[in-house]
Amino acid sequence: MAKVVGIDLGTTNSCVAVMEGGKPTVIANAEGFRTTPSVVAFAKNQDRLVGQIAKRQAVMNPENTFYSVKRFIGRRPDEVTNELTEVAYKVDTSGNAVKLDSSNAGKQFAPEEISAQVLRKLAEDASKYLGETVTQAVITVPAYFNDSQRQATKDAGKIAGLEVLRIINEPTAAALAYGLDKKSNERILVFDLGGGTFDVSVLEVGDGVFEVLATSGDTHLGGDDFDKKIVDFLAGEFQKNEGIDLRKDKQALQRLTEAAEKAKIELSSATQTEINLPFITATQDGPKHLDLTLTRAKFEELASDLIDRCRIPVEQAIKDAKLALSEIDEIVLVGGSTRIPAVQAIVKQMTGKEPNQSVNPDEVVAIGAAIQGGVLAGEVKDILLLDVTPLSLGVETLGGVMTKLIPRNTTIPTKKSETFSTAADGQTNVEIHVLQGEREMASDNKSLGTFRLDGIPPAPRGVPQIEVIFDIDANGILNVTAKDKGSGKEQSISITGASTLSDNEVDRMVKDAEANAAADKERRERIDLKNQADTLVYQSEKQLSELGDKISADEKSKVEGFIQELKDALAAEDYDKIKSIIEQLQQALYAAGSSVYQQASAEASANAQAGPSSSSSSSSGDDDVIDAEFSESK
């Protein structure tokens, strides 16, 4: 079988590896480096440059040099507002999709197209190394990437001419590389702080089994954000001294960005660094130069809020894994940004353990992807990888409630189904609104897409049985199917190009869910109460109609009175009154029902007949039907 390579498609740098002789090997690129900058540029002659050569010319060609593209992939225009100010190239958000504008190429590119150029270079370099054409790959993504971002990454692979056999999470890949030869069971925490994203995963590793217990993250926290802190500091100091904002000059901004990255790297080993940028700009008085000293202490002060943000996903992952930090055996650092001393210090402070630095943080993810590639190719035996989905998935039901089908941190691949019904008599279609998030209300979660199931035979509400099936594959990509059990009509949607989560929304969902738990619970209880009251009104009117003259006029009048009171309370949204009248109406119905049975029993005795004379017909479906309904799509 052909070789399957493992690719870490990073925000700042990318890496490719392959299994050779049962061991993973990192493949150096054509320039001799083991990592490749995730940078693509278009020169004036329209030549396409990829990797180190593209990065080197960025200062002279800032508007046609594309970097940190991973922050745009799989996202909608309204979700990249913050990113627009952090790059020197033009990002077009006027249409339905994000486009990257290149004046030299004379066209616009989708982020997937730019990422595909990086993937293509890695595949070509691997092909030269192996002496055979590479056509299959395992590509890694941040654990907190959503469905659209995962699919967009897969599409980038396809554009690059690769068959993407699997999309796997970066911290999981790192755990594979770390734990390949581990025989004894260990609980490990992977702390993955890369160029653009931050992931934390808790895994149980040992004897070939890699089980993810929980994952958390922040999709807008990485090395780029640390660089921006330095850029803003340098630009602020220069503006204070010279009255000029360098951030408005794209060429100067590119020079500042490169200087900031270099300073950040130097401060990992030195306590201070000199930043010299001669001829950074010019005025009528002549050229201006930037010359500053940046200490590690000042850098840590500038980035203190970013470092503090590292705490939340760690705490969330530990909580979701139902473990204490003392139960974690090893802390594995992944991603170049974990070289920052302050980051290592906060990890040690939180966990009370020295982080394990036995793996190369720049290469370990690609190595893990190569191991997974070896598993899929049959080269690596006796490895079982059990990953999870990072966010809950569900559908919107009556009252705007999110009904969860798959809770977050569920092992994938997985398939779950639930049966729902209609909300109105004669309803012939339902709209399935697929959601992702942790809040109780649909409007507070992220919409992944909607689709409609038509052709439901007209029937009283609550009678049709509509089975909704959620199927997440090993790539973490979701497919949803809705099927009417009566007619056999079926409709499905693959959540691929749907609306996706913005950079702040994913982690905000979990935080908001906890912060707003009480309010969410109250709103959910109110909607449940309204649904209960609606159903009771419907059933009561139906029962009165069926009983006819079997109950006395007084009993009938009493029930009708409570029904009207309940309708009035519903209209006024008086929840205390709704609760009170529900109880009174139920008691009145019980009394009416009892009198019917007593009357029937008396008649039976008079006729000397034994046995029941009536039977209950209250069952309306099988036990799997959830007490939640769809509103009819107009």
From Swiss-Prot:
Stretches with biased composition (Low complexity): 601-620
Q: Which residues carry this modification: Phosphothreonine?
A: 197
Enumerate the residue ranges of region (Disordered).
Answer: 601-634
The signal peptide here is none
Q: Which cysteines are joined by disulfide bonds?
A: none
Record-linked Pfam families: HSP70
Gene3D superfamilies in the record: 1.20.1270.10, 3.30.420.40, Actin, Chain A, domain 4, Substrate Binding Domain Of DNAk, Chain A, domain 1
Whether Phosphoprotein counts among this entry's keywords is yes
Please list the residue ranges that the record marks as compositionally biased, kind Acidic residues. 621-634
SUPFAM superfamilies linked to this entry: Actin-like ATPase domain, Heat shock protein 70kD (HSP70), C-terminal subdomain, Heat shock protein 70kD (HSP70), peptide-binding domain
Q: Which keywords annotate this record? A: ATP-binding, Chaperone, Nucleotide-binding, Phosphoprotein, Stress response
InterPro entries, per database record: ATPase_NBD, Chaperone_DnaK, Heat_shock_70_CS, HSP70_C_sf, HSP70_peptide-bd_sf, Hsp_70_fam
Entry's Gene Ontology molecular function annotations: ATP binding; ATP-dependent protein folding chaperone; unfolded protein binding
Chaperone as a keyword?
yes
Family, as annotated: Belongs to the heat shock protein 70 family.
Function of the molecule:
Acts as a chaperone.
Q: Report what the protein is called.
A: Chaperone protein dnaK2
Origin organism of this chain?
Synechococcus elongatus (strain ATCC 33912 / PCC 7942 / FACHB-805)
